[in-house]
Amino acid sequence: MTAPRASGYFRIRYDDDIALVRTRTQRVWLGVLALALAGFPFLANSVLLDLANQVLLVSIGAVALMLLTGFAGQISLGHAGLLAVGAFTTGILFKELAAPFWITLPASAVAGALVGLVFGLPSLRLRGLYLAVSTLALHFMVLHAGQEYETRRGLSSGVVIDPPSLFGFALQDGRAWYVVLLAASTATVLLSLNLLRTKTGRSWRAIHGREAVAEAMGIHVPVAKLSAFIVSCTLTSAAGCLAAYYRGFVSAEAFPLFVTIQYVATVIIGGIGSLLGALLGTLFVVLFPQAIEASMNALGLTDRLSSMIFAINQAAFGVAMILFLVFEPQGLVGIWRRIQAWFLLWPFGQKPLGRP
């Protein structure tokens, strides 16, 4: 005898069907989350605030990559280069023109959109590994241009950027940055959620499945691909601008290839094709190295292995990626969905917690 499963379609209005928050339970949990996020900066110390700000910064780029790879199915290995586009656009405008924040941020976004248009063109002819290699070229080209600028201007330690001012308030402490980055991250998620429900977002999902079928349905595949690259690159470049201001300097050495790998891991570990997966993957990628270092401190191994901490973090990071690819290809969001299904079916069935 099989366990009964939840069934039925309980929405009776179109407004209910298109609502972002569809149930009372979701409203309650979102309210709790909003209260927790609002109260966090008043309870956290400077270290926790810095970690939270890093999570918010990375989440913008992770959502952008999820739109491109997770929904549109276009592989990109140039994410660190896109961050560098936004950061160097900000640094050059500040250094050469003393441009304020309200100019450098949109300028960085426009620069990212132009780069996305140019480097999205190969996606019209290339797929898979070949497309990945073409986007990897973006990384090295941008970093080379950044290094040339630093060399010609004699900036051996990078471009130093003063803290920006927003509505008359200088962003000099972690709490002020937390508010700005939380607003930016929330806006990115809401924009992405609504974009995925438009004609453009549905075309991305279609070309991810099978391009020939999408084209037969009347979808202009080249336009869909280019729009995915442009939107993703715009958001990522804007995140690079915010990262440059938050760190207070811009340098080509701050964007190694490992940053791209971290963002790809965010998508894989979080779960392909889910914005929630991008956010869960961001938490994992940012907090996992901290957990490794805390474990080493607890075991008293920090002094002995101090010179190997970075290598240990990278090795543990690689092992985690392999384990997720082999044993949990749906990522953290897959685990979360099975937990939800378990509570939905309880006490009649607990099968969803096992392997599907």
Regions found by a protein language model. Give the residues of each.
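Transmembrane alpha-helices and adjacent helix-loop boundaries
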Residues: 2-356
